[in-house]
C-alpha cells in the first residue's frame, strides 16, 4: 500500500538571495521527496518564504518600498533559483498569506483557551526617535563585563559574556544612533513547560537523530522556559487577536507556514488536508520536516508543543543537517566562497552540485565541505567518466550497425541480476537519508558496468562480421545496466534521467522498472548527456561572487586607511611592558559544546600542557563544536577568571575578524605543542 507523506524544508528568510548554504537542505529534501514518488508513494513537498519580522520591515524602509513589495521581489527571486536547481516543490507559498494568518490565529486561540498563554510585563529598550522597541540585535554599546565597545545587546563577542540589553553600558540604537530608554511592555508567553511530558515522550521515540535527542535532554535538564511569542508595534507581521499593538513573533507563524502552504496545495488539488494534520488521523499519513541543526530548538520543542496544544498531530520525524563549509572554511564573501545560487547557475550545471551534495550527505548533523578541487574531480570522474560513459561507449554501435535496435536478449543476465538485486539496499539508503552511501553503491555498480565493457571489447569484435550479434547483445547489456543506474540516480539527477529516457525512447522511469530489461527496442541517436567541468568555470563562480560583494560596497573613494584598517583602525600604541603582561599559550581544544541560552557561546575545555581550563568563547556563530575539537588555539592564560551565569571562564581564546559568522580562531603553526608560550 502506498504511503501518504508530507515533506517540508525550513522557510528561507525573505530579505536576501538563496546561497549554496541554503541549497544543502533543499537538495537533501528534494532528493528524498523524489525518491518517495519514484517508489510509488503519494508524497507532497511544500515550502514558503518566511516573510515577517523587524529585519524585513527595516530593509524595506531602507529601500523606500513597502514590506509587501520587498517580499514579493524576494519570492520571485527565490522561486526562480529553486526551479533552476530542480527543487520540485508541489507548492511554494508565503507566511504573509491569508492561510497563514488563519492558522496562526486559530492555533493561538486554541492555546489561549487551553490555558497555555500568559501575559507578563517586561522591560525593554525603546528608541524614542524611531518610536519602537529594539530587538537585541538592534542595540549596541559597551560590554558590562570587559568594557569592549560596539557589542550587541545580548552578548559580547570579545569576552563571550551574556547579559540583558538593560545591562549594556552606553547603549545606542543601531537604527537611529540615539540612546534608547528603558520602558515596560506587556508581552504574551507560551507555557512550554505544560508540554514537558509530551515532549519527553516524543523525543524518546524514533522521531529524531541521536545527536538531537541528546541536545533535547540537555534542554530538559536545564528546565523549559516560557516562550515570548509577541512583539510590539511597529512590526511587520500578524496582529495578535484582541490587541491593537501586539504582533506574533516571527518564529510563531513561520513553522505554521508549513500548514498554510499545504492548505493552499490541498485546495488546488482536492487533497484531504485534515488527513495530514488532524491529531486523530495521524496514523493515516506521515509528516517530515527537514531543517538545519541551528533551528532544532524551535522545531523540536515549541513546534510539536504548539501543534499538540492546538489539536494537531506532531511530526513523524524532524531531520537535521549540518552546515556547508567551502574549502574547509565557513563561507566568506571576501574569499568569494559566499556563493549565491544565481552566481553558480550562471556558470555551472545545477545537477553537478546536486550530485556532489548527495555524495557528501548522511543521516548526521555533521557539517559537509564543498572542496572545489574535489568537486571538479568527483563530477568529472563519477558522472562523466563512469556513469554517462557507459551509454557513450555502447550507443554508437547500436545506432550505426543495428539501426538503433536493441538485441532481444542480454549477454550477461547474471550481471544484470546483480544490478537489480541492489535496488532494495539502495532504496533503504535513500530512505534513511544516507545519500553518500547510496552514491558509493551506484558508482561501484558503474565501475562494474565499465569493467564488463572493457572485458568484452565491442570495438574489436565489431571488426569480425560473425560477431555482430554478440556486439549487439553486449551493447544492449551495457545500455540496460546504464538504464538501471539512471533509475538509481534519478532522485539526485532528474534532468539527466529525463535526457536518458529521451535517448532510450522510453517514458518516465519508476523504481520498479529496474527488474525488467529493455529488449528488442528502438533507441534514439546518442547525444552527450553531460560534459566535464573546466576548473575555469569554478574560478568564474568565485570571481563573480567577489564582484557581487564589491558592487554592494560603497563606491566612495577611500580617504586615509583603506580595507580592514578603515573599518577598524589600529588602537593607541602600547609599550613592550604592556604586552609582556599577557601570558599567551598554545592550547588544544579537548571538549567543545554549545551553551544553552547563549546563541554565541561555546564552552571549551582547553589542554594547556598539564592543566585543563574551561573557557566560554563567543564563536558559536562561526564554528560548530565538532570543528573545534582537536584544534590548537592561542589562549590568554593569565586572564583573571570571570564568573558567568553558565560557569566560570578561565581564559580567552584569540580570534580574528569583526565577529558573528565572520570570525576565525587564531592557531599556531604545525609543531607548536600545548603549553608553549606565544611571544
Curated annotation (Swiss-Prot):
Residues 545-569 are annotated as: Disordered. CDD domains: Anticodon_Ia_Met, MetRS_core, tRNA_bind_EcMetRS_like. Zn(2+) binds at residues 143, 146, 156, 159. GO terms for cellular component: cytosol. The gene is metG. Residues 578-679 form the tRNA-binding domain. Its EC number is 6.1.1.10. Residues 548-557 have a biased composition (Polar residues). Keywords: Aminoacyl-tRNA synthetase, ATP-binding, Cytoplasm, Ligase, Metal-binding, Nucleotide-binding, Protein biosynthesis, RNA-binding, tRNA-binding, Zinc. Is required not only for elongation of protein synthesis but also for the initiation of all mRNA translation through initiator tRNA(fMet) aminoacylation. Pfam families: Anticodon_3 (PF19303), tRNA-synt_1g (PF09334), tRNA_bind (PF01588). This is Methionine--tRNA ligase. Belongs to the class-I aminoacyl-tRNA synthetase family. MetG type 1 subfamily. It is an enzyme of class 6 (ligase). ATP binds at residue 333. Its main location: cytoplasm. One of its GO terms (biological process) is methionyl-tRNA aminoacylation. PANTHER family: METHIONINE--TRNA LIGASE, METHIONINE--TRNA LIGASE, CYTOPLASMIC. The keyword tRNA processing does not apply. It catalyses: tRNA(Met) + L-methionine + ATP = L-methionyl-tRNA(Met) + AMP + diphosphate. It comes from the Bacteria.
Amino acid at each position: 500500500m502506498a504511503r501518504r507523506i508530507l515533506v517540508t524544508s525550513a522557510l528561507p528568510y525573505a530579505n536576501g538571495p538563496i546561497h549554496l548554504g541554503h541549497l544543502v537542505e533543499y537538495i537533501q529534501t528534494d532528493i528524498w521527496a523524489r525518491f518517495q514518488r519514484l517508489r510509488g508513494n503519494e508524497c507532497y513537498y511544500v515550502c514558503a518564504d518566511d516573510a515577517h519580522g523587524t529585519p524585513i520591515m527595516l530593509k524595506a524602509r531602507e529601500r523606500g518600498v513597502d514590506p509587501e513589495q520587498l517580499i514579493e521581489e524576494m519570492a520571485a527571486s527565490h522561486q526562480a533559483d529553486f526551479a533552476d536547481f530542480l527543487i520540485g516543490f508541489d507548492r511554494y507559498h508565503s507566511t504573509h498569506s491569508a492561510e497563514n494568518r488563519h492558522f496562526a490565529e486559530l492555533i493561538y486561540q486554541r492555546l489561549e483557551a487551553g490555558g497555555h498563554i500568559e501575559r507578563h510585563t517586561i522591560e525593554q529598550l525603546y528608541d524614542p526617535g524611531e518610536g519602537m522597541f529594539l530587538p537585541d540585535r538592534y542595540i549596541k554599546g559597551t560590554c558590562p563585563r570587559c568594557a569592549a565597545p560596539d557589542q550587541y545587546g545580548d552578548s559580547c563577542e570579545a569576552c563571550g559574556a551574556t547579559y540583558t540589553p538593560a545591562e549594556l553600558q552606553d547603549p545606542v540604537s543601531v537604527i537611529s544612533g540615539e540612546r534608547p530608554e528603558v520602558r515596560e511592555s506587556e508581552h504574551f508567553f507560551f507555557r512550554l513547560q505544560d508540554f514537558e511530558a509530551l515532549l519527553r515522550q516524543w523525543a524518546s521515540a524514533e522521531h529524531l537523530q541521536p545527536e538531537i535527542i541528546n541536545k533535547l535532554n540537555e534542554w530538559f535538564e536545564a528546565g523549559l522556559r516560557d516562550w515570548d511569542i509577541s512583539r510590539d508595534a511597529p512590526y511587520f507581521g500578524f496582529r495578535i487577536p484582541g490587541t491593537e499593538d501586539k504582533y506574533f513573533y516571527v518564529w510563531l507563524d513561520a513553522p505554521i507556514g508549513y500548514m498554510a502552504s499545504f492548505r493552499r496545495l490541498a485546495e488546488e488539488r482536492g487533497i484531504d488536508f485534515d488527513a495530514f494534520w488532524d491529531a486523530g488521523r495521524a496514523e493515516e499519513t506521515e509528516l517530515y520536516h527537514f531543517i538545519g541543526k541551528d533551528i532544532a530548538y524551535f522545531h523540536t520543542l515549541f513546534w510539536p508543543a504548539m501543534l499538540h496544544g492546538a489539536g494537531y498531530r506532531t511530526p513523524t520525524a524532524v531531520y537535521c543537517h549540518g552546515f556547508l563549509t567551502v574549502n574547509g572554511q565557513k563561507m566568506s564573501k571576501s574569499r568569494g566562497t559566499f556563493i549565491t545560487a544565481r552566481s553558480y547557475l550562471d556558470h555551472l550545471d545545477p545537477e553537478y552540485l546536486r550530485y556532489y551534495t548527495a555524495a557528501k550527505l548522511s543521516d548526521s548533523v555533521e557539517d559537509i565541505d564543498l572542496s572545489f578541487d574535489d568537486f571538479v574531480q568527483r563530477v568529472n570522474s563519477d558522472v562523466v567518466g563512469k556513469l554517462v560513459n557507459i551509454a557513450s561507449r555502447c550507443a554508437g554501435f547500436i545506432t550505426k550497425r543495428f539501426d538503433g535496435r536493441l538485441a532481444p536478449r542480454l549477454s550477461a543476465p547474471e550481471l544484470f541480476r546483480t544490478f537489480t538485486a541492489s535496488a532494495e539496499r539502495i532504496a533503504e539508503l535513500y530512505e534513511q537519508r544516507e545519500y553518500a552511501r547510496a552514491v558509493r553503491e551506484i558508482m561501484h555498480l558503474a565501475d562494474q558496468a565499465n569493467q564488463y565493457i572493457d572485458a568484452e571489447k565491442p570495438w574489436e569484435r565489431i571488426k569480425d562480421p560473425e560477431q555482430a550479434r554478440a556486439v549487439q547483445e553486449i551493447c544492449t547489456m551495457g545500455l540496460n545496466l546504464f538504464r538501471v543506474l539512471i533509475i538509481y540516480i534519478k532522485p539526485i539527477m532528474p534532468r539527466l534521467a529525463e535526457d536518458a529516457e529521451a535517448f532510450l525512447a522510453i517514458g518516465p522511469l519508476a523504481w520498479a522498472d529496474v527488474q525488467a530489461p529493455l529488449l528488442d527496442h528502438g533507441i534514439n541517436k546518442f547525444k552527450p548527456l553531460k560534459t566535464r567541468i573546466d576548473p575555469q568555470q569554478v574560478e568564474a563562480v568565485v570571481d563573480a561572487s567577489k564582484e557581487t560583494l564589491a558592487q554592494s560596497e560603497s563606491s566612495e573613494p577611500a580617504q586615509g586607511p583603506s580595507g580592514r584598517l578603515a573599518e577598524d583602525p589600529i588602537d593607541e600604541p602600547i609599550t613592550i611592558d604592556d604586552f609582556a603582561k599577557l601570558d599567551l599559550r598554545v592550547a588544544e581544544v579537548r571538549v567543545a559544546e554549545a551553551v544553552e541560552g547563549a546563541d554565541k557561546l561555546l564552552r571549551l575545555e582547553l589542554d594547556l600542557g598539564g592543566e585543563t581550563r574551561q573557557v566560554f568563547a563567543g564563536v558559536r556563530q562561526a564554528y560548530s563544536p565538532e570543528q573545534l575539537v582537536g584544534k590548537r588555539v592561542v589562549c590568554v592564560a593569565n586572564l583573571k577568571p570571570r564568573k558567568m551565569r553558565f560557569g566560570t571562564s578561565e581564559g580567552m581564546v584569540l580570534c580574528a575578524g569583526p565577529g558573528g559568522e565572520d570570525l576565525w580562531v587564531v592557531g599556531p603553526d604545525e609543531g607548536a605543542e600545548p603549553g608553549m608560550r606565544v611571544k
